Amino acid sequence: MNTVVRTRHKTLIPTRYTQFAFLSSLNILRLSICCYYHQEYLLGFLLSWLYITTNLHWKRVYKRSVYWKIDKFMTISCFLYAGGRAYFYDCASVYYFRTMVHLYVFLLNDFWNKQTIYSPSRMAKMSSIKQHLHYIRACVVHFLFLHLLQTEAGIYVLSQCKRI
């Protein structure tokens, strides 16, 4: 008799921290609706899928999971398409500046994550308080700059700027 032993992969970030993604990702859905309202249908469609993949990914964060890969693909697709569409609005420079700030903060946060939460050996050496603070930092920075502020930049362009 062959026995298959399945090991449960350890999540990178405990779900008690990632559950707030369900709230912060609502802004992605809000931007999607705003896109439909302003006749940016393809971007609205892409953002609808990004909302779904974001929630699937943040339900349990595993390194290099299928949901992580799909979410990353959808994020990059939305990032590139939104950047291209912003060019056709009179305040594109504001959007591009804010996007570059958010991208810089994301990369800085990702670098810090690689030094902490992506390194089980380093996390094992930390006190539970330090681990707790790193999880909070990783999630809050990601949710604030990408789920909230970046989507607000998109909503600003659609609602306050004129298409040229």
Predicted regions mapped to residue ranges:
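Early transmembrane hairpin module of multi-pass membrane proteins
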Residues: 1-164
